[in-house]
Amino acid sequence: MKDKNEKKEKKNSAKAGKKGKLKRVELIFSAAVDEDFMDGFKKKGIGAHFTKISGVTGAGFSNPKLGDAVWPQLNEMIIVYCPKDEAEKIIELAEKIRDKYPMEGIACFVSKAAIR
């Protein structure tokens, strides 16, 4: 069953990409909430195909995450290319986690994408 769903998801993403309806969702968040995102993806059946970059440093609207002696925390970054409906579910998950952990620094950016 999983293989059929994966093939269907891949086909839908490819169709969306060729029609210019593919979305790029970028999530940047404190490493402390990584498990919340990964569990949320799994439970909601979203974000099955993603790129994850660990040890991301930066400063946004919460405390800096620089991985040094002064600001020792680090961020994670996840990039997902998906159809609009899946992007909306990822946004909902990010908002839910942000509400649960308002001081952790969780950013979500969505843009149009296309397969070339």
Predicted regions and their residues:
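Positively charged, small/polar-rich N-terminal and surface patches that mediate targeting and assembly
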Residues: 1-116
